A protein has these predicted regions:
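Interdomain hinge/linker segments and adjacent boundary elements that couple functional modules
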Residues: 2-21, 25, 30-35, 49-179, ...
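C-terminal regulatory/effector modules of DNA-binding transcriptional regulators
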Residues: 165, 172, 182-287
Length: 287
């Protein structure tokens, strides 16, 4: 996955949305813009969908054609400058998928994250030993070097929970996550200790969805919802799959996931009862 690929960031997505809106407001089709500026129609599509980052001269030509004056013009040019800055995923691009790299960048700038996990602990809360056990089991063919980079990425991601304006994290775990022995008893005890330590933070809420809750909306799989501090940046959903990952945008789809999460947290144990369940699991492992 090495190379000069464009990894999505919050600012690149914002610039793409801005340029699409400007073109629509100017009443111009992509074909007309292409004819007047010489910018390929495919390139315009990629720029407006944040799949490509425009060069400054390309952006200037678009702004000129759309008749964009100050302060919007400076805002767009500044977004391009900001979009050139490497995101958190820059250090790990060779070890992660393009979509996951984009997710890491989004997570680093998010205001809040809502996780539902049905199979294993959220990456933000994993210990190094737990993460190693997960990767060795789920991705047995990847190299030790890639595994090491991925684990380092997860450990560095956790910094969003401790910065001055920390990420607000709400996690709902299926009970299966705490019952499944990953890496052995010692690894699980350490992992539970990490979980419990994080529940003491004011910005972290953890709930367990018990087996006796029965059928639930999350049975189709895990997902993450990200919200951002700027209203110009719409919330999105990250879904991790076996063959590929997916970032979902668009109000109707994202709203459905939001409703699902609300249903799951309503069905889950209270944070206090969830902590009690984890503490009981620790005692069972240590006995």
């Amino acid at each position: 996955m090495a190379g000069k690929r464009t990894v999505l960031t919050v600012r690149l997505r914002r610039l793409a949305a801005m340029l699409h809106e400007m073109r629509e407001h100017a009443g111009l089709s992509k074909e007309v813009v292409s004819a007047k500026t010489g910018i390929n129609v495919t390139t315009l599509y990629r720029i407006e969908t944040a799949q490509a980052r425009p060069q400054r001269r390309t952006l200037t030509a678009m702004l000129d054609l759309y008749g964009i004056a100050e302060p919007q013009r400076s805002d767009a040019l500044q977004l391009l400058v900001d979009a050139l800055r490497p995101g958190m995923a820059r250090s790990f691009e060779d070890a992660v998928s393009e979509v996951y790299g984009a997710y890491i960048n989004f997570e680093a700038e998010a205001l809040s994250a809502r996780f539902f996990q049905s199979t294993y602990m959220p990456g933000l809360l994993q210990t190094e030993e737990y993460a190693l056990a997960v990767y060795q089991t789920t991705m047995p063919k990847i190299s030790d070097q890639v595994i090491e980079q991925r684990i380092r990425a997860r450990q560095e991601r956790a910094g969003v929970l401790a910065k001055d304006d920390p990420l607000e994290l709400w996690v709902v775990l299926d009970e299966a996550v705490i019952r499944r022995l990953v890496g052995g008893r010692e690894v699980m005890v350490q992992q539970f200790s990490r979980l419990l330590d994080n529940t003491e933070k004011r910005n972290v809420i953890l709930q367990i969805l018990p087996f006796d809750a029965g059928a639930h909306p999350g049975m189709l799989g895990s997902f993450t919802l990200l919200d951002f501090p700027d209203p110009a940046d719409p919330e999105l959903v990250y879904v991790e799959g076996i063959a590929s990952d997916e970032l979902i945008e668009g109000h109707p789809e994202v709203r459905r996931y939001g409703v699902m999460f609300d249903q799951l947290r309503a069905m889950a144990l209270s944070p206090r009862d969830s902590i009690n369940m984890i503490q009981e699991a620790v005692r069972a492992l240590e006995s």
